Design a protein with these regions (language model features):
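Conserved hydrophobic/aromatic "anchor" residues
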Residues: 24, 36-39, 94
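Bacterial N-terminal signal peptides
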Residues: 7-15
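Bacterial N-terminal signal peptides that target proteins for export
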Residues: 1-6
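Functional-site microenvironments in short loops/helix caps that host divalent-cation chemistry
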Residues: 46, 51, 56-58, 63-84, ...
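Short, structural beta-strand-to-alpha-helix junction motif
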Residues: 31-32, 87
């Protein structure tokens, strides 16, 4: 039994949260810009990236001035996109504010690959560990091009390929296929912090 719910947060790009209705106690989606904004409004918190710029990997780590959780690519982004450019200590502060904690690496892996729900949908089997966070196939595992599958929109989801108005980057949270334990974006989108 977990002492505190898990806060799923990403490194320079960010995820977070915990819910009782997902077997491993992790929220279904990454922490959004909107959710992180609530934390900032309540606490007056300021991130390092707001002062010094965000880090991106372009054949090596590069600092991008004005890139931060509010402006992931130097421009304002919608509140349903994942909060990014968050350091480990900032992720810990956010989790603590929510009464949560970062998952241990093995907890994150188990949540993303081993079905733990008591009554999962027919496409999943309780106790089974899958090769991909979406099950037996990488299709829908949150690759920008659907991991090579056809690019038709997923039923009930926005056409997130068109939504990436920058032409690159991450998708809004929860726009991809629901995977193991009903979680989204465990196959990519942004990097998560774990202990």
């Amino acid at each position: 039994m977990l002492s505190r719910p898990l806060c799923l947060i990403i490194s320079l790009i960010f995820v977070a949260s915990a819910r009782a209705d997902t077997a491993p106690g992790i929220d279904q989606t990454e922490v959004t810009i909107g959710a992180f904004a609530e934390f900032v409004a309540a606490t007056g918190f300021r991130t390092k990236a707001e002062d010094a710029g965000g880090m991106v990997y372009e054949a090596g780590w590069v600092v991008k001035p004005d890139w931060n959780w509010r402006h992931p690519y130097g421009i304002a982004s919608p509140p349903d996109e994942p909060a990014v450019h968050i350091t480990f200590d900032e992720a810990m502060a956010y989790c603590d504010w929510r009464g949560q904690r970062l998952p241990h690496r093995d907890e994150w892996i188990r949540a993303g690959y081993t079905e733990l729900r008591p009554d999962p949908p027919a496409s999943f089997q309780r106790g089974m560990t899958y090769e991909f966070p979406t099950g037996n196939s990488p299709e829908g595992a949150n690759c920008l091009a659907e991991c090579g599958a056809d690019l038709r929109p997923i039923a009930g989801k926005r056409d997130y390929g068109r939504y990436l108005y920058r032409g690159f980057g991450h998708a809004p949270v929860g726009q991809t296929k629901s995977g193991v334990n009903g979680l989204f974006d465990m196959g990519a989108n942004v990097w998560e912090w774990a202990v």
